[in-house]
Amino acid sequence: MNPLHSTQKFQGRVIRVSVDDVQLPNGLRTQLEVVHHPGGAAVVSLDAQERVCLLRQYRYVADGWVWELPAGKLEPAEPPLATAQRELEEEAGLRAAHWSSLGAIFSSPGVFSEVLHLFLARELTQARAAPEANEVFEVHWVPLQEACERALDGDIRDGKTALGLLRAAHQLRAPAHRPEI
């Protein structure tokens, strides 16, 4: 992003909000409100029975419980894979021997700069979970096919989770598309 001018309106612990003067590709000059976020990573972790680890997590902003993949924000200078590995261990108490990329997505590109990196993790082993004090969730193991059906029928409403599940199922049907990392 290269604004003509940017005015910071808010700086929080995670996000920054600015009003940017920009020139669009069609030549129009306008002001846009932008929420700057460091980005994040989410993990579709599959066990040997092709079950996925899902968190049923309380989210204040959603006013209730939401099904989500283990995920978290990128720390400064932290590669997305390292974020994914850290979050999988902290939230689910898991490590994985094999990782592959499921690509990256925008959470809401009209307003947010956040890019979410999606990963598939396999050959899981137990580790010590260390969730943050403000994280309230339950860990559930759901067959991947059932999780995809839940994403398609609207039971799973979190975008990164729904798309991560569908991309993982697609990659497993056509594994040559994404190399292991």
Give names to the regions the model predicted.
Residues 8-12, 60, 105-116, 173:
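Acidic pyrophosphate-coordinating catalytic loop
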